[in-house]
């Protein structure tokens, strides 16, 4: 089963019949329109390309306009691709709704995490701070030593140091599906998902379910 592209609306909570509060993230999944179907013969692999949402006509390039017109769909805010498992078939112009998750218990959600800019090691890697006093007047939040000695005489690749934090692709796995609202194109999942409100999300059935 393929996934769908949605948009993060925000977080809220719902109550069960027993009065238990469940924190949920609301994901709006408008109909995903199939723009292209890739095949083994033509492309070397099986996949389906989809778009969703809308894009202003004056923001659509001519190549994009031709691509959407060929599929007979309205121009969307982007293009996403999902590998097609054996036995599943789609056609260009077809619409896929949030209802495909009606019988799914858990999902994996992929998004772009919030960018935090340049961050130090305490914030980025949870390094502990050094002494506040006892002779330490300058080095409270510095990382400390980053190497050894003349041997190896270098800083190893992957060393945890200060640098850019966030704004990267993150996947949260096996989130419980709490509710599927087909009328309003909403999917409610338990817990938090990556990214800011309004960010694009890719929702797939959980691989570890």
Swiss-Prot record:
Pfam families: Ribosomal_L3 (PF00297). This is Large ribosomal subunit protein uL3. It comes from the Bacteria. Coiled coil: none annotated. Belongs to the universal ribosomal protein uL3 family. Residues 133-152 are annotated as: Disordered. The keyword Chloroplast does not apply. PROSITE patterns: RIBOSOMAL_L3. Signal peptide: none annotated. The modification N5-methylglutamine is found at residue 150. One of the primary rRNA binding proteins, it binds directly near the 3'-end of the 23S rRNA, where it nucleates assembly of the 50S subunit. GO terms for biological process: translation. Keywords: Methylation, Ribonucleoprotein, Ribosomal protein, RNA-binding, rRNA-binding. The lineage of its organism: Bacteria, Pseudomonadati, Pseudomonadota, Gammaproteobacteria, Enterobacterales. GO terms for molecular function: rRNA binding; structural constituent of ribosome.
